[in-house]
Design a protein with these regions (language model features):
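Short coil-to-beta-strand transition motifs
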Residues: 62-65, 132
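Extended oligomerization regions of viral-like shell subunits
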Residues: 67-69
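Short conserved beta-strand and strand-loop elements enriched in small hydrophobics
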Residues: 48-62, 73
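Residue microenvironments linked to proteolytic maturation
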Residues: 14, 19-22, 72-164
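Short, flexible beta-strand-to-coil junctions
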Residues: 25-29, 55-59, 119-126
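Polar/acidic, low-complexity leader/linker segments enriched in S/T/G and N/D
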Residues: 1-51, 160-163
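Short, surface-exposed beta-strand/loop "edge" segments at domain boundaries and coil↔beta transitions
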Residues: 26-35, 58-63, 91-98
């Protein structure tokens, strides 16, 4: 068994001023690795408190790039993935909120390629993930690997998230 670090795409919907509901990761193949639903479900506790940065970085992270934090991770049976609330905060919070609003307004445009990507450490072998060890970050990026996108804006409707 080997340990691997990987960045994976996410999906998101706004649920209030500065808050977004995101689909952090779903079961399936990404970057040559298969992520089984059971492994993702077991990783739920690792997602709470994970920071969101603007852009991935190969260097040490800067506090200037903090855009938010993940809260309330739950298992979403219908999408076979981890769902969580992303709360905007930090020096780059306005970037997150502004881009989210703009992408949601232009959601029908094929040219919009901004979304989220998870930077994770896992154990696996033969192309199959066996255990997620750590979530380093969930980052706002251009052209995420699995096409993570903003889904819809609920904050304009005053809808609060429902976690079943």
């Amino acid at each position: 068994m080997t340990e691997r670090r990987q960045r994976l795409a996410l999906e998101v919907a706004s649920i209030g001023s500065g808050r977004f509901e995101i689909l952090a990761i779903t079961a399936g193949a990404a970057n040559g690795w298969e992520f089984p639903a059971g492994v993702l479900r077991e990783s739920l506790g690792l997602w709470d408190g994970v920071n969101c940065f603007v852009d991935h970085s190969l260097k040490a992270r800067s506090v200037r790039d903090i855009a938010g934090v993940l809260r309330k991770p739950t298992w979403d049976e219908s999408s076979q993935g981890v769902r969580a609330e992303l709360c905007a905060f930090g020096p780059s919070a306005e970037v997150l909120k502004d881009i989210g609003r703009q992408v949601l307004e232009e959601s029908d445009e094929a040219a919009v390629k901004v979304g989220f990507s998870a930077d994770v450490l896992f154990q696996g072998k033969a192309g199959k993930v066996e255990k997620i060890l750590r979530i380093y970050s969930v980052d706002l990026v251009y052209n995420p690997a699995r096409g993570g996108i903003f889904l819809r804006a609920l904050n304009q409707l005053g809808i609060n998230p429902i976690f079943e």
